[in-house]
């Protein structure tokens, strides 16, 4: 089932300059975020229940969250050479993050936006991975 949903949002190969490496990394990250037994800390993947308990406008919490997520993703995704994590939205019921990724063997950065939506993470940019 997850395989089908990923195929539905992946960019079309024809007429798109998206490399297989970029598509693979984005697909694997989305799978990692949505895995019920993810190796990422629960606040990072099951974000909303834990996020609502804290003050989402707390800049220290936001900074901590970004650092923890960056560290975990660099550990679990060896194809990432450099990573910057930014919170785009952080409200009680909304969490949107942007990952600025530099991959090994790729000269251009990759932007991958994720949004917590209805109990799971979805890509806000997977259709337009560049």
From Swiss-Prot:
GO terms for biological process: cellular response to oxidative stress; DNA damage response. SUPFAM superfamilies: gpW/gp25-like (SSF160719). It is found in: Cytoplasm. Signal peptide: none annotated. It comes from the Bacteria. Pfam families: GPW_gp25 (PF04965). GO terms for molecular function: anti-sigma factor antagonist activity. GO terms for cellular component: cytoplasm. Keywords: Cytoplasm, Stress response. Inhibits RpoS proteolysis by regulating RssB activity, thereby increasing the stability of the sigma stress factor RpoS during oxidative stress. Its effect on RpoS stability is due to its interaction with RssB, which probably blocks the interaction of RssB with RpoS, and the consequent delivery of the RssB-RpoS complex to the ClpXP protein degradation pathway. Interacts with RssB. Belongs to the GpW/Gp25 family. IraD subfamily. HAMAP family: IraD. This is Anti-adapter protein IraD. It comes from Escherichia coli O139:H28 (strain E24377A / ETEC). The gene is iraD.
């Amino acid at each position: 089932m997850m395989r089908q949903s990923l195929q539905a949002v992946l960019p079309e190969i024809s007429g798109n300059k998206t490399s297989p490496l970029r598509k693979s990394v984005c697909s694997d990250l989305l799978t990692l975020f949505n895995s019920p037994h993810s190796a990422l800390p629960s606040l990072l993947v099951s974000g909303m229940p834990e996020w609502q308990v804290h003050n989402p406008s707390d800049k220290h919490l936001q900074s901590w969250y970004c650092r923890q997520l960056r560290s975990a993703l660099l550990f679990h995704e060896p194809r990432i050479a450099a990573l910057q994590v930014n919170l785009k939205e952080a409200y009680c019921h909304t969490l949107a993050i942007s990952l600025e990724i530099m991959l090994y063997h790729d000269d251009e950065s990759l932007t991958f936006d994720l949004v917590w939506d209805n109990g799971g993470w979805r890509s806000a940019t997977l259709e337009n991975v560049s």
